[in-house]
C-alpha cells in the first residue's frame, strides 16, 4: 500500500475514535436562572437569554430557558437535571464545571440612603449590609463582617430608611429595580462597588462537557468579532470585553 494512502487511513481512523470518545453535541441546552428583570425574564427575553441564544443557536443548539430561584437553579445543575445555570461566579459551587470564558460581568452596587457616607470596596466592611440569600457576596468582596441575607427583594427601601441596614448589595439591574419602587428616589444613592465575571455553571455530565466546549469555542469567536456588542447596546448595558 502507498505510504501516503496508509497514513491517510490511519489518520481517518484516529479522527473517528476521537469523535466517538467526545460523543455527539446535543441539539438543545436547558439552562436555569433566577428571573432577573430585563436580564433573564420568564418569557425568555432579556440580555442574558439573548446573549446565550447568539452563543448556542448558530451552532445548531436550541436554548430552552427555565425560571427558578437562584439556589434551586444551582442544585438542578449539580444534579444534572438541567445543563447549567446562568449567573454563576467562578468556583462558587462544587460538583459543576466552569468554562474559560465569562459571558458578562456582574456590576455590583451598594444601595443606601443619600445621607450615608459613600462606600467603597475598601470601606464596605465597616457597614451593615444585606443581600438576597444564596449570592455569597462575602466570598467575593473583601473584609465583610456585618451582613444579613434576606429571602426576597420586598421591603428593602423601608429596611434602609429605618436603619436596619446601611446598604443593600446587588447587581446594577436589580438595584435599579428596587430603587424604582421609591416614592422619592433622591433619598437614595447607588454606588458602584465591584465587577464580578459571570459564567454558566455547567452540569458535570457528558452533555455538560460537550456543551461547555461549544460555549468556549463560540465565545472566543464572538468576542474576537465583536458580534455581542449590539446585544449589550440594545439592553443599554456596558460591554464587558
What are the roles of these predicted feature ranges?
Residues 8-16:
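Bacterial N-terminal signal peptides
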Residues 21-96, 130, 225, 235:
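Extracytoplasmic small-molecule ligand-binding "clamshell" domains
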Residues 33-34, 105-108, 180-219, 239-241:
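Periplasmic-binding protein-like
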Residues 47, 51, 123-125, 171, ...:
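Short amphipathic alpha-helical coupling segments at ligand-binding clamshell hinges
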Residues 62-69, 145-152, 156-159, 189-190:
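Short beta-strand-to-loop elements that line the ligand-binding cleft
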Residues 75-79, 88-96, 166-194:
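A ligand-binding cleft/hinge motif common to bilobed small-molecule-binding domains
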Residues 111-129:
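Flexible hinge/capping segments at coil-to-helix
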Residues 136-152, 219-241:
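Ligand-binding clefts/hinges and TM-proximal coupling segments of bilobed small-molecule sensing domains
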Amino acid at each position: 500500500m502507498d505510504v501516503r494512502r496508509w497514513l491517510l487511513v490511519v489518520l481517518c481512523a484516529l479522527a473517528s475514535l476521537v469523535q466517538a470518545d467526545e460523543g455527539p453535541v446535543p441539539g438543545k441546552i436547558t439552562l436555569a436562572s433566577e428571573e432577573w428583570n430585563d436580564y433573564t425574564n420568564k418569557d425568555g427575553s432579556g440580555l442574558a437569554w439573548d446573549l446565550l441564544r447568539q452563543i448556542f443557536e448558530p451552532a445548531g443548539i436550541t436554548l430552552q430557558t427555565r425560571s427558578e430561584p437562584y439556589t434551586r437553579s444551582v442544585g438542578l445543575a449539580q444534579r444534572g437535571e438541567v445543563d447549567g445555570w446562568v449567573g454563576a461566579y467562578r468556583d462558587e459551587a462544587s460538583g459543576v464545571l466552569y468554562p474559560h470564558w465569562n459571558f458578562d460581568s456582574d456590576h455590583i452596587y451598594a444601595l443606601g440612603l443619600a445621607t450615608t457616607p459613600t462606600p467603597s470596596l475598601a470601606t464596605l466592611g465597616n457597614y451593615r449590609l444585606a443581600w438576597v440569600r444564596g449570592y455569597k457576596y462575602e466570598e467575593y468582596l473583601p473584609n465583610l463582617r456585618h451582613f444579613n441575607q434576606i429571602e426576597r427583594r420586598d421591603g428593602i427601601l423601608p429596611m434602609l430608611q429605618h436603619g436596619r441596614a446601611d446598604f443593600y448589595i446587588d447587581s446594577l439591574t436589580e438595584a435599579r429595580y428596587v430603587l424604582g419602587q421609591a416614592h422619592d428616589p433622591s433619598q437614595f444613592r447607588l454606588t458602584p462597588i465591584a465587577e464580578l465575571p459571570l459564567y454558566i455553571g455547567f452540569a458535570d455530565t457528558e452533555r455538560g462537557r460537550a456543551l461547555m466546549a461549544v460555549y468556549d469555542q463560540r465565545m472566543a469567536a464572538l468576542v474576537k468579532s465583536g458580534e455581542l456588542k449590539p446585544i449589550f447596546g440594545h439592553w443599554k448595558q456596558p460591554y464587558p470585553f
